Design a protein with these regions (language model features):
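Helical (often loop-to-helix) elements that flank the catalytic cores of nucleotide-handling enzymes
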Residues: 190-213, 241-254
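Active-site palm subdomain of RNA-directed nucleic acid polymerases
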Residues: 152-207
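Conserved, charged catalytic cores of large soluble enzymes
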Residues: 294-321
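Catalytic palm active-site di-aspartate
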Residues: 77, 112-114, 147, 169-193, ...
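Catalytic-core region of right-hand nucleic acid polymerases
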Residues: 21-157, 246, 250-299, 306
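Non-catalytic, polymerase-adjacent accessory regions of viral genome-replication enzymes
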Residues: 1-26
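Short, conserved secondary-structure transition motifs
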Residues: 106, 115-118, 217-242, 284
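Beta-sheet entry/capping signal
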Residues: 64-65, 71-74, 105-109, 172-175, ...
Length: 321
């Protein structure tokens, strides 16, 4: 049974952590990986240790922790405090804007922030609003955390302001998607490949400089800082030399394996159906209207579920008879 609230801010509550079974891709259990991640956060200043349970006052709301197991990520289940938050709508850039943003004969680069939410520090007087408990200790967040529904808007507004500044004052074309950005050769000038390469490299160097001044860290492993003709951004392979979009082989294989698994089982959970529909629609730029036609039945089922016409969100749905 749910609980009703009639107040302007969340009452104090303590929730238990929700650890998934199994091991992460690093070979650790969820609590082990989470504890290591929390210790790293304390070391960087993104998380603050309050003290041991029973020796210090807990945060106003003790939120449950969980771990995304595939690509290990610490998740703060902030659904409780999110009920009292009202983030504004915003629109993210997409791969579909590449043709209108970058020159057709230009090269491309991209960078990806590392722990980007940690660039947004919380005022010390507000850090006790919510936190968590692990291994008998209370912690609060000293910077942004994954799970609080206000963070995407804050992140988007701040990062796009940086990119727009670079576009206005340095003429650097770019697109941004939360912690990920794409840049390319500058407009103007001739079509000399050497000059196109030089301008693209200069552009990404300026963007990196601005990011460091703004307090962001960049993941070298996830970034492509050397200008190139072929680059994968937001799951789509962009061929700037041929002016074409492609589906990366790994992504194509992942979707095919998912579809074959569903076919063999004969049914699918609602959560997996939502994920499958999203994955297929993300291929729209490369396969065109076929993505909409293929997923039409998926979205029809999801709409009927939301209207209460069929099943519940916990039931499995049969797509094959």
């Amino acid at each position: 049974m749910g609980k009703d609230y009639d107040c302007d801010s969340p009452p104090s509550r303590k929730f238990q952590n929700n650890w998934p079974a199994g091991v992460t891709s690093t070979g650790e259990t969820a609590p082990e990986w989470a504890w290591k991640n929390v210790q790293e956060g304390v070391g960087t200043g993104a998380i603050r240790l309050l003290g041991k349970v029973g020796e210090v006052d807990p945060p106003h709301v003790v939120l449950p922790l969980s771990v995304e197991m595939g690509k290990p990520r610490l998740i703060t289940d902030a659904r409780y405090v999110n009920l009292w938050c009202d983030p504004g709508p915003f629109t993210l850039d997409s791969v579909g804007q590449v043709p209108e943003t970058f020159r057709r004969d230009g090269l491309l680069c991209n960078y990806d922030h590392k722990s980007g939410y940690h660039a947004f520090g919380f005022d010390e007087s507000e850090q006790g609003y919510f936190g968590f408990c692990i291994n008998g200790c209370y912690f609060t967040f000293a910077a942004g955390c994954f799970g609080w529904n206000c963070m995407p808007e804050i992140y988007h507004v701040a990062h796009m302001a940086l990119l727009e500044f670079a576009q206005k004052w340095f003429d650097i074309p770019s697109l941004g998607y939360l912690d990920d950005a794409l840049s390319g050769s500058l407009w103007g000038g001739g079509a000399d490949p050497v000059e196109l390469h030089r301008s693209a490299r200069w552009g990404v160097e300026v963007l990196l400089w601005l990011n460091f001044l703004a307090g962001y860290s960049v993941s070298i492993k996830k970034s492509v800082l050397e200008p190139c003709w072929r680059i994968t951004w937001l799951g789509i392979l962009i061929d700037a030399g041929k002016n074409m979009f492609y589906i990366p082989p790994k992504k194509k294989e992942a979707v095919l394996q998912l579809l074959c698994g569903i076919r063999d089982r004969g049914s699918i959970s609602v959560r997996l159906l939502e994920s499958l529909a999203g994955k297929c629609m993300s291929l729209h730029l490369a396969v065109g209207e076929a993505a909409k036609v293929f997923t039409r039945a998926f979205f029809d089922v999801l709409i009927r579920i939301r209207k209460g016409e069929i099943g519940t969100k916990k039931q499995a749905i049969s797509l094959f008879g």
